[in-house]
Amino acid sequence: MSTFVKVTDLITIMFFLAIAAVITASNTAELDVLEMARTAVVEAKTSFGSMAVTEATSEVAGSYYKLGLSECEKLYDESEARLSKLVVDHENFTVEDVRTWLSGVLANHHTCLDGLIQQRQGHKPLVHSNVTFVLHEALAFYKKSRGHMKKRLHGPARQGHGPTRPKHRPTRPNHGPGRSHHGPSRPNQNGGMLVSWNPTSSRADFVVARDGSATHRTINQALAAVSRMGKSRLNRVIIYIKAGVYNEKIEIDRHMKNIMLVGDGMDRTIVTNNRNVPDGSTTYGSATFGVSGDGFWARDITFENTAGPHKHQAVALRVSSDLSLFYRCSFKGYQDTLFTHSLRQFYRDCHIYGTIDFIFGDAAAVFQNCDIFVRRPMDHQGNMITAQGRDDPHTNSGISIQHSRIRAAPEFEAVKGRFKSYLGRPWKKYSRTVFLKTDIDELIDPRGWREWSGSYALSTLYYGEFMNTGAGAGTGRRVNWPGFHVLRGEEEASPFTVSRFIQGDSWIPITGVPFSAGV
């Protein structure tokens, strides 16, 4: 008996040693993959930085090209910061966190190249191909490895609340009794900080009013004050923007995490500008409001770009913020209104207006209970609601529109029959978009979807529709592309839900914003 026990113990020990060896090898492989990705990004950043320095003193290079190089530096700087965080703390991230951040790094890379092409400038092929290849391999590694890495990286699930919260994620603001307040108190942070905030009874860190009755007259002044707080600032900073039209170009950079903006309501608090591509911006740079700081929340604000349809690409809002959320906001523009650039995003009870590709980008974005208003384009144009930009089969990005409504904007209603309108078209090779239980107006063409150029991406894209309603929801005459799918059951639709697509049940509840975790 004792011999048997010893043999059994030996087998058990050998088994656990083998498991430990696999885990160690896995950790080493992960670190190697992330280090290679960071090295490639740093090399690209250095290369484009050198080019920017050279062009800054050149009398030949145009200012638009210099602008494109400057944006590339910024994008690679953001990517380097994310990859450095992953290298140091990769064991504290879930698999989906890592895949999301790698997907965001790849989106930054492609955005840099797209911007240079837009300015009719080339790029260094070696830099391009090296970064693309390394990030593709890193994404493939995590997609293939997530089975055996799942337990170690995800840890035990919290009962009924999804995965445990990794250290990098936005945390609950820490304003305990030790911090003295003057005036109204902050809302109950455990009861829905964003939803419960009230301008008459809740406290903001900064207040913006055009008439000078608050701490600042402009949003940019308030954000500058946030920057000056440095490391001493609160976990979440609340900025209340009173009713008014704020003609500003705003950029919330990667250092400004956990910013919460609250306005006085759609079409009452308005942030506006008119930058556009024909006048010299890149699509990325044309945004009236751009945000790269993670954990960004906004409520009761309109973001708009007034450049008009004749100015083509003109972004109202660009979002490159992980775990970002927009509640009761409006986004107004024509072409390229809402740039869901990268990372995980949630939109609830929002209004989106536009004509061509007006919800686009390479984020993992979910829209719930939103109203999508198709506007009148120029006479020779058609309308495409979405243009999702997934360019690698291993990224976890896409657009999911759920429990929403597609309608003609008031000025378009009477003439909508004169124009072709579609649910979307494939901006990139692996474009991925689904409409789930959404009410679709008859303005949508029976084909549903439109080609980008010939047969490009028709076999590699993923477009899906599930249980939609309305006169434009019939799938009998939809396109017969290999990549188009009529989803037959909830099991096919569930990968695109809040819970699974953006892991929202682990980070949305603290806001208090209502959401459906499933189909």
Curated annotation (Swiss-Prot):
Binding site for substrate: 283, 313, 425, 427
Catalytic activity: [(1->4)-alpha-D-galacturonosyl methyl ester](n) + n H2O = [(1->4)-alpha-D-galacturonosyl](n) + n methanol + n H(+)
Any Gene Ontology biological process: pectin catabolic process
Cellular component terms per the entry's GO annotation: extracellular region
SUPFAM superfamilies reported in the protein's UniProt record: Pectin lyase-like, Plant invertase/pectin methylesterase inhibitor
Region: Pectinesterase 36, residue numbers: 205-505
Positions of region (Pectinesterase inhibitor 36): 27-141
Pathway(s) the chain acts in: Glycan metabolism; pectin degradation; 2-dehydro-3-deoxy-D-gluconate from pectin: step 1/5
EC class of the enzyme, as a word: hydrolase
Domain of life: Eukaryota
Gene Ontology molecular function terms on file: enzyme inhibitor activity; pectinesterase activity
Biased composition (Polar residues): 186-196
Transition state stabilizer (site feature) positions: 335
Role: Acts in the modification of cell walls via demethylesterification of cell wall pectin.
Additional facts recorded: The PMEI region may act as an autoinhibitory domain and prevent untimely PME activity during transport.
Family according to the record: In the N-terminal section; belongs to the PMEI family.
The name this protein goes by in its record: Probable pectinesterase/pectinesterase inhibitor 36
Gene: PME36
